[in-house]
UniProtKB/Swiss-Prot annotation:
Belongs to the UPF0371 family. Gene3D superfamilies: dip2346 domain like, Domain of unknown function (DUF1846), C-terminal subdomain. Pfam families: DUF1846, DUF1846_C. This is UPF0371 protein CLH_2534. It comes from the Bacteria. It comes from Clostridium botulinum (strain Alaska E43 / Type E3).
Amino acid sequence: MKIGFDHEKYLEEQSKYILERVDSYDKLYLEFGGKLFNDRHAMRVLPGFDENAKIKLLHKLKEKVEVVICVYAGDIERNKIRGDFGITYDMDVLRLIDDLRTYELEVNSVVITRYNGQPATTVFINKLERRGIKVYKHKSTKGYPTDVDTIVSEEGYGQNPYIETTKPIVVVTAPGPGSGKLATCLSQLYHESKRGNAAGYSKFETFPVWNVPLKHPLNIAYEAATVDLKDVNMLDSFHMDAYNKVTVNYNRDIESFPVLKRIIEKITGKESIYKSPTDMGVNRVGFGIVDDDAVKEASKQEIIRRYFKTGCDYKKGYADKETFDRSKLIMEEVDLKETDRKVVLPAREKSAKLKMATDENEICPVVALELSDGTILTGKSSDLMDGAAAVIINAIKYLANISDDIYLISPVILEPIMNLKSKTFNEKNISLNCEEVLTALSISAATNPTAQVAMEKLPLLRGCQAHATTILSRADDTTLGKLGVDVTCDPNYPSESLYYNN
C-alpha cells in the first residue's frame, strides 16, 4: 500500500488547533461527527491514517476533556443497527463507554434526546442508571428549527436539564447521525450563558475535507459513504462571501447555518465569530495529506466498495432504489467500473467456470482475495466449508509456503463439528463458516506445527481486499472484518432459499 497520509503530523496539527479554539472560551462544546473508534473509512481513503486517530487525539488531551454521549430515543425504539459492528445503537452506547474508559477518558453522562417516555428507552435508562451512569433526558425542542425566539427561551432549551461538566473541552459524540449532538451542544450553550459562563461551540467532522477540491475523489468518497443520508458536497457560499476563499462543506451544514448562527447570537447576545459553516469546524485532516495521487486512488477504490455495499443493502431491503441509483451516478461521475476493483473479475470468472462445469442454475459462491504483494487467490464454497473460509485457508497456506495438497485441519476435528451442526443443532447448512474453520485450525495448531505456522500468517491479511460473487453470511462478514479484510459482494444470494441464506 502506498502511503498518502502523515498520521503524526495530523495529530500534532489537530491537537494544537483544538487547544487554540478552546483558549477563546471558559468551555468549548465540541461536536464529534463520524466515528471516534475504528474509522475504517478514513483509514481506507487516507492510506497511513490510523483508524483510532481521533480517540488517540482525545487521549492526548485527556486532562482537559470529558465526554457526553447522545442517543435518539427513536433509534433505541426501532433497534437501529450500526452497520459496521452489527449492533444496536443502545448496545453501541455501552461499547463506547467501555472503549472511552480504556483510553482513560472521563464519560460524563448519556443524553437521551427527543425522549417522550418510550418503553424500550426507559428500560435502557434504568439499565444505565443502575450501572452508575448519569443519564439526562431531553425532549424535542419547542419551535425548532424556525422559531428562534421560542427555541432560545425557557420553553425551548430551558426545558432541558443542565448537564454539569467540569473540564474545558466537552466532547459530544453519538453512535451515529441524527442522535441530537448539535441540539445538546446548543442547549448547553443556553444554560452556560444563563450562568454567566463564556462557552463556545465547534464541530469536528473529518469529511468532507474543507480544503480539498469539491470534486476530489476523497470528497466524492464521502458522498458515496453517506448516500443513504443524501448528503451532497457543496462550495461554502458563506465562506466565499466572508473571505473570498473556496472551501467545501455539505448541504445539511450549509442549509442549517443561517438558523444556527441566529440561535448562537440569540444565546450570547452578540454577533457570532463564525461567518460560515467552515469557520465552525476544527478539522485539519487535509494538512496530513502527503501524496495526493495515493489518496485519489484509495478514494476511488472506496467509491467502488460503497457502490457494492449499497447494491447489497438494496437487495436486502435496507436501501431504497433512489439511494442505489445515486450510488451508480457517483460511480459514473468518477468514471469508474465495477471491475476497476481488482478482485471482482477473478471471483466472477472462477464462479462462471464452476457453473459451467457443474451445470448449476444458481450462482457458484466464490471469494477472491488480493494479498499485499498483488497475488490474487480464490476460494469456493463446498460441502465442507464456505468460500470465505476456503479463501482464508488458501491465503495463509500461500503466505506460509505450504503445499496445496497438505491438509491443515484433521478430519478428526472437522467431522465432529459438522456432526454437531447436522445431528444436534439440526441445521440445514452444515458447511463450516470462516470463524468455525479458524477455530478448528487453532485446535489443530496445538498438535500440528504446520497449522501453527499457517495461523501465524493471519495478521498479514489485515488491509487485504476481497470480493464475493454472492452476499456473505453475517457471520463471515463479521469474521473478515475482525481479520481486517475489506470485502465487497455482488448483490446475489447464494441460493433461492429465503431464510437459510442468512
